């Protein structure tokens, strides 16, 4: 019997202790919103970059809750990174987003970047038919010149569990940096620890999976050809922070030219279910 999708949408008042539980010293006091679908709850903090700070199935959390200033939750950047270097653009990554709610859809819009003239819009909605949460990102060129840009979602999860995607081992670069193995036709990485930061690139098939604590998180997005990502970037990236801190599940969209006033839209579909669920996601 198909599960009934239930939508719950409301603002959560944030106490100081609540904010500290999710991260230390936020830029602003948290302004949290929630989407609910059956047993899945997604929480978004509009006051701090419109980040996804929590994703739970019942009471089991899949987003990393390890305290890391500014390096927490699921965020969004523009690609390639060389356009802004480091740190990430504050208006996109950590500053407050304006919020609009309509028909059980949450839309959050960034301030215009002082570094690059791009505005980010994030729309969060429940897809009842497919039992997932859809996050649609928009990049809007509000400058006076053409810009080439790609969308980039970064999701931080605990440094445990298994990451997998559909790509040959030979296509993962740099080779040998992480202990990926072939299992059931997929490239699979049981997260381990090392005293250095590691990051790999791969050309996948439009999805990225993560298993931990008996749950399966699946993110689905546009499948790219090897020529479509931004220069020196990739459709799928995995970053492992040194030690046992957090891991980033990253995916990018196509490198696109935006004329002044134009925008691009890019959707990521989030599925979360018990690993032993009968529904097949890959």
Question: Locations of the language-model features?
Answer:
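Bacterial Sec-dependent N-terminal signal peptides
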Residues: 1-21
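Short N-terminal segments immediately surrounding and downstream of signal-peptide cleavage
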Residues: 20-38
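Extended, loop-rich substrate-binding clefts of extracytoplasmic carbohydrate-active enzymes
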Residues: 21-23, 27, 81-130, 148-149, ...
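Acidic-aromatic substrate-binding/catalytic surfaces of carbohydrate-active enzymes
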Residues: 32-93
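A contiguous, surface-exposed recognition patch within enzymatic or periplasmic domains that forms
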Residues: 40-42, 50-53, 61, 131, ...
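Hydrophobic core residues within well-ordered beta-strands of beta-rich domains
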Residues: 120, 133-135, 264
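Terminal connector regions
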Residues: 272-282
């Amino acid at each position: 019997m198909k599960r009934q999708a239930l939508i719950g949408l409301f603002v959560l008042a944030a106490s100081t202790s609540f904010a500290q539980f999710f991260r230390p010293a936020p830029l602003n006091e948290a302004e949290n919103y929630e989407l609910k679908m059956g047993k899945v709850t997604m929480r978004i903090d509009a006051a701090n970059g419109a980040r996804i700070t929590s994703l739970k199935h019942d009471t089991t959390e899949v987003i990393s809750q390890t305290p890391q200033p500014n390096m927490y939750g699921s965020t969004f950047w523009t690609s390639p990174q060389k356009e802004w270097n480091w740190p990430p653009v504050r208006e996109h990554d950590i500053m407050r987003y304006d919020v609009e709610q309509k028909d059980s859809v949450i839309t959050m819009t960034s301030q215009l970047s002082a570094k690059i003239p791009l505005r980010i819009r994030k729309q969060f909605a429940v897809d009842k038919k497919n039992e997932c949460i859809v996050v649609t990102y928009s990049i809007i060129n509000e400058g006076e010149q053409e810009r080439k840009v790609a969308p980039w979602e970064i999701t931080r999860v605990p440094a445990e569990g298994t990451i997998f995607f559909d790509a040959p081992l030979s296509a993962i670069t740099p080779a040998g940096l992480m202990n990926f193995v072939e299992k059931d036709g997929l490239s699979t990485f049981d997260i381990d620890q090392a005293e250095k930061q590691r990051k790999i690139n791969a050309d996948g098939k439009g999805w990225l999976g993560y298993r931990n604590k008996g749950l399966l998180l699946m993110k689905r997005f546009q499948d790219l050809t090897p020529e479509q990502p931004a220069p020196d970037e990739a459709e799928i990236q995995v970053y492992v922070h040194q030690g046992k801190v957090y891991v980033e599940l990253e995916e990018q969209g196509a490198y696109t030219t935006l004329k002044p006033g134009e925008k691009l839209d890019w959707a990521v579909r989030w599925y979360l279910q018990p690993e032993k669920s009968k529904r097949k996601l890959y």
